[in-house]
Amino acid sequence: MNCFEIGCIAKARAIEKGKLSILLISPRTHNFYSDWSVPPIGPAYVSAALKRHKKTVFTLNLEKEEGSIADIVQNAIKEWDIDIIGFGALIVNWRQAEEAFQAAKECKETIITYLGGGSMTCSPTEMMELIPEVDIGMIGEGEITACEMMDTLEQGGDLKNVDGLVLREPNGDLHYNAPREIIRELDSLPWPDWDGFKFFDQEPAGDFPNRLVCAPLVTSRGCPFHCTFCSKSTGTAHHQRSMDSIFAEVDHLVQTYGINRLFIDDDVFALPIWNQDAGQESGRKYKSRLEEFCDKIKPYSVEWLLYLRVGEYMTDELLSLMKASGCVEVFYGIESGDDTVLHSMHKGITAAVIEDTVRRTHAAGLGCSGTFIFGDPAETLDTVERTFAFSDRLSDQFTNMSFTPIILFPGSSLYKKAVMEGKITDRVEFIRNGLPFTNLTSMSEEEYRELIRERIPAQRVKRMICEETSHRPQKLMIDYNKKALYINHVCRRCGSSSEIYLRPESLTDHTYHLCPKCKQRVDYIVMKLYAQLVDQYVEELLQDGQTVLWGAGTIYRYYQAFSGVLGKLPYLLTDSNLDLQEHGVAGHEVVPPDKLREKGICRAIIMAWYNYSPIVDDIHKNYPEIEEVYDFRELVFHNKQSADKRHL
């Protein structure tokens, strides 16, 4: 709908009902965590602001709902008589927003839709074209904008007067309102609507005394640094909440929900001050904010994790103070082990500084995680080798390392470079195709594709095997009634035994908990044990040649590394990714989905995280001959007879 139609419909509905009702939706994230998750909280902030503004607000957390997104949304619209539906989405889950809005328009033609979140903030033009069912785009922070939008709609005003919106003109053009100023007084915002989005309605984790109840805690917004790969969806102006405001919320979380772990969900928790005279970073302000937080959080006896920047200001004294106050893990932005690449990324750090900070963090008894990304314009075969060697040298210092190609997120400097150089010719199709990996390096296309398809996945598997050997999970147990996996584990540091509940998604190197005795991180690499449990059933399904493995990404690669079946049986593998179709995966052909009809396929095993629901919907709509669909993550529960024991 265009802005004129929206105004007419909203005015009529407001006269009829007195107030408009809005439904806010939080996407499915399929978190990889074992006993806690940190879902996106942007919609929860907007919901809290609207409720404080006395609006009629309903909420859906798709992560907590069973069934298709279309059915969930349509049922909610009918039950609650919804007038407006809002969705907060990142680029990676825009298809969920599309599905929700399409279902909404089918259910109620006059419903008003708006899209917010990082996807709209970074790519408003593209998202409005990509999802024609979106009536209103909301750019930037949504708390004030959403309230003004609702007021304007209920009062019959002109939406063009609401800062921070993108609207459709009657002729189809887009109208960009004035930008919304950033919210500098973060203390003025209400706390997120935890209850509305069922944040703490976690699945039962058994009678374990170590069960974690984790809450995300936003203490600041914005990041002033200029890393070339970052989309800057939160802006470059850094503004912080006061400690009084922060700990009023901590009090509420602990007393009301029994929180025993906090994840500080800031781009940068505190900033070092650049000392122009000394030519180096000074830690005075940075240290004082961290010190104050440590002093205040210690009496709560909760665990906490955060993102920080490496540097000399991370002193041994500060790290010890963090450890003593309950900090269990620090996530550092590593990115590369090569100084040339780090400089090209505008990181402002060196490999030597990274190594020094990581080693001192580990020595302080804190968990240390880092991500290595590949494909910067300065990347060469030599820099790749140096980064791999760097990660190997520090392998025993990290509790978690991940390896991934650089993704060109809209809004980032690298994305803009790719557009200017003609590497991205259609920005809408680029998003629709899932932000395909794009070669900005001086490497040949063949060398780059080999890095993406073979070398980075091999480094991931190498890390997995290293962790599996060092941590040694002893038992993978299955509860068929609850569809739950449990691991019994002996800590390699202190020798104590613990059990932990796992989501069925927890088959990658992103799964961990803390040893209840020594509080050190324990990584679970369960794919090897899981593969042993499901191999027999997979073999039965593949035997007649009528089963396809759908999805050639991470979960497939990890299963391929540990499966005793895939290496001895012919099987069909499909994926919509054009690059995978062209080059295959680990020597195996990837068939386009539209070629399946001629293959006589009648069943599919879905091997995907984020795209599971869209794949299933696609199969139901376009491949009726595929009558049986299995979720690989839950395949073990179909295999009760093959796994006649509860554990290995």
Outline where the language-model segments fall.
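Glycine-rich beta-alpha loop elements in corrinoid/cobalamin-binding modules
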Residues: 49-185, 405-407, 411, 628-631
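Generic structural signal for well-ordered alpha-helices
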Residues: 43-47, 73, 98-101, 150, ...
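Radical SAM [4Fe-4S] cluster-binding motif and immediate context
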Residues: 192-367, 499-514
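Glycine- and acidic-residue-enriched helix-capping/strand-helix junction motifs
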Residues: 31-43
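Conserved beta-strand elements of the Class I
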Residues: 21-23, 215, 228, 546-550, ...
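C-terminal accessory regions of radical SAM enzymes
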Residues: 3-7, 14-33, 166-169, 382-523
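Hydrophobic, well-ordered beta-alpha structural blocks that scaffold small-molecule cofactor pockets
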Residues: 482-503, 513-648
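Conserved C-terminal portion of the radical SAM core fold
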Residues: 52, 84-86, 112-113, 247-250, ...
